[in-house]
Amino acid sequence: MYSHPHNAGVAAAPQKPETFMLSTEAQQALPHDAQVALQQVDNLKYFLISAPVDWQPDQYIRRFLLPTGEYVSCVLWNNLFHISGTDIVRCLSFRFQAFGRPVKNSKKFEEGIFSDLRNLKSGTDASLEEPKSPFLDFLYKNNCIRTQKKQKVFYWYSVPHDRLFLDALERDLKREKMGQEATTMAVSEPALSFQYDSSQSLYEQLTKAQQANSSSFNAQQVSFPPSQSTSPVMRAMDSMPPPPQMMPQPMPQSMAPLADGLDAMVPYAAMGMAPGMPPQPAVKREPDFNRVQYNQNGVPINQGHQRHASMPAYGLEYSPAPSFVSSHYDDYGNRGISFEPLTPPQQAMGMGAEPAYIANEETGLYTAIPDHMNGVNGLNGMIQLPPSNLAGPQFTRSYGSNNVYSVIEGSPTYKQRRRRSSIPPGMSAIAAATAAATAAHRPSDLRRSVSASVGPVAEGDESLDNSPPGLIYSNQPMSMANHQREAMEQMSRHGTPLSTVEGSPGMHNVNLEQQQYPMPSEDMTSPMDDRSRPMAQGGPSVVRRARSATVMGSEVGPYPQKSHSCPIPTCGRLFKRLEHLKRHVRTHTQERPYICPYCSKAFSRSDNLAQHKRTHDRADGGEGLILSGEDEEEYSGDDHLGSLEEASPTSEGGYVTSSLNSAMAHSNTSQHPGSNAVSPNPGPMSHAPTYNSMQTLMQPMQMSQPQPINAGGMM
């Protein structure tokens, strides 16, 4: 049904739902119109991956213009990102048109999609809205829904877009096979070349194609450490195989802010660079390894460079490559509605390191910003982003032919395609071996299989053990890395910005004084109540995030074995459990859906809110140490692995309130053992050092960022 080239000279065919049955040669032989249409599908997937990133405080909706003329919107409501069922149908209708099977019975087609969407349950993967609720009214006014009747609005990353496409396609293919009327009709390539194998579902066939593609891609790569030499021969071996030779498209070097309004589009050629930009230096062929600079996650640029080079095919396949750039360069952030570009970055063979990009929604092109800019201030405080061309300046990624945006997986509860953690401990090693066969081998797989056979591992351990190799300082001895990890744990408990702690597991020797990234006030920890867990469970993610909408992971099999990758390109962390990825993504999106009913303070984790509630209980004269049934259920999180995996050294730690005086009072009470606020179990804290509370409070105050918006309050 489909073929896979296994010779080392040809790159493996990209395994996308539309073309996974075609060989590389067949894909290259597709008509030009079909290739353009499939590229437009990739542009949509890029938006589906990246829409919740880099939002401004006054922004509550971000739109993507489909080639059909309709918009798909990402809506921020109650600190969660949503997509409507109507927009999901619009995405799928466009994808079928690009696939060569335009919809001819839209009503029946839409009914099938909404039937599939019933598998996404409210409260877990969607928000059930009452008729004419403020949220539905907002969606209706922005053309996201057609009616304000009672309906579910889905969490952004809970929607399995590719699975919905394959399920809808399979329904129509079965109808055609039985002689019934289908909702779509094949009129062009690649739909005309699609051969349906009814012995197994299309989703299973795609999964097997993904696995076979991953294996063949791995066989082409040599496991060398990232080279820092100037020899292109050695660099070619530790980078991705070169893309097909295509003529470079000239990248315009300037653009201007866009005017407000829906139709205020400026011709691309007439746009000028935003004021205040420094002169653009020549892009160097080789990165400068003599100086150490840090990206927004606190990872040195050369370490990020190594991460991209050493990321296995598994990581390359599921993580988008281009770097995000703050919307400082355009005027998107100055209005409530944002528009996304029509295309992700295209290849530019003549350039050195693949640059970051600025979006232009008019033409669908991106303006390149050199990686090596003299003025860091031009990035609005963001330190330089790492070159993202996988360590090979000679070979930039080709978005039209390589594995990119292959599978967008939503909620694991969709049609129960992924089992919960019900595998017996003895089977964990087998699961690890299975994952190693289907995904690229990682040196830490053996450690994970041993750890999993003993018991669950705290998320802090996972972040180091299973991050891409380049994220951890490979040039440091393990003892030194562990020592610095413990030091980072202590610092993170007393004022380290969350974005730097959780966003980069390998950030050990970063000078925190230079970090310009914020830490929300409710996430500052004080030494008041650090009494909860043994320090052995700690790690760089000792301050972690709460349950979130389900986030996409990568599809490598039914076993819970590190199959979830952070969709943010500059991060790329891997997680075994989807719940951990959900919490981690909130460090990027700054969602805080848990609101205190007493003071309306927002929290990103339910256990943080539960701990905060206890401060109110203590203020009312109660101990506040016993959780109610509802709080305990929230505190336990989504998974059922017990307290070990869910535990965090600061999960029950006290949080600084909005009043500096109350924070000082709590700090003073924590230093007097006779106080009623002291934990009845002060054992673990008896060996912890005492910190100056003013110093603790002052450190995060050097960092400023507007608080995340609550669109509900704006209405």
Curated annotation (Swiss-Prot):
Q: Where is the composition biased (Polar residues)?
A: 648-679
Knockout or disruption consequences? Impairs pathogenicity on rice and barley leaves but does not affect appressorium formation. However, fails to penetrate onion epidermal cells and to cause spreading lesions. Reduces significantly the expression of the cell surface sensor MSB2.
> Which keywords belong to this entry?
Metal-binding, Nucleus, Repeat, Transcription, Transcription regulation, Virulence, Zinc, Zinc-finger
What are the cysteine partners in each disulfide bond? none
Fetch the InterPro entries from UniProt. Ste12 (IPR003120), STE12_transcription_factor (IPR052127), Znf_C2H2_sf (IPR036236), Znf_C2H2_type (IPR013087)
Any GO MF annotation of the entry: DNA-binding transcription factor activity
Q: What does this protein do?
A: Transcription factor that may function downstream of PMK1 to regulate genes involved in infectious hyphae growth. Is not essential for vegetative growth, conidiation or appressorium formation. May be involved in the regulation of the expression of the cell surface sensor MSB2.
- UniProt-recorded name of the protein: Transcription factor MST12
UniProt lists the gene as MST12
